[in-house]
Amino acid sequence: MRKSLLAILAVSSLVFSSASFAADLEDNMETLNDNLKVIEKADNAAQVKDALTKMRAAALDAQKATPPKLEDKSPDSPEMKDFRHGFDILVGQIDDALKLANEGKVKEAQAAAEQLKTTRNAYHQKYR
């Protein structure tokens, strides 16, 4: 009986701890916004790379979420496909900026990161 109880507690703690690792959409959006500000103020490639890496992870995680405006839509709906496509675009732009940062081109990476704002604004207008 005691071993069963311990096993149940162990499994339930794993389930609850793994659920806390997945950030919600709002947290991911905040991560994207905060790190975009870091990129704008950065003065070295390491800062830019770190911020872009965090942004990439947040964008990929956010892509799996459903925005409140689309909660009544099926995952295969055109709107949800477009929502996810927006993150594909964003991740591509992040990758382009990351490539520049890896080459030590800080100013160019910052300029490339400016495109993220255009994508953000377009998709916020649709789904926020």
Curated annotation (Swiss-Prot):
Keywords: Electron transport, Heme, Iron, Metal-binding, Periplasm, Signal, Transport
Pfam families: Cytochrom_B562
Cofactor: heme b
Single biological process term from Gene Ontology: electron transport chain
Cofactor info, note text: Binds 1 heme b (iron(II)-protoporphyrin IX) group per molecule.
Biased composition (Basic and acidic residues): 69-82
Spans annotated as Disordered: 60-82
Record flagged with keyword Ion transport: no
Signal peptide: 1-22
Positions bound to heme b: 29, 124
Disulphide-bonded residues: none
Superkingdom: Bacteria
Molecular function GO terms recorded: electron transfer activity; heme binding; iron ion binding
GO cellular component, one term: periplasmic space
Subunit field text: Monomer.
NCBIfam families: PRK15058.1
Protein name as annotated: Soluble cytochrome b562
Originating organism: Escherichia coli
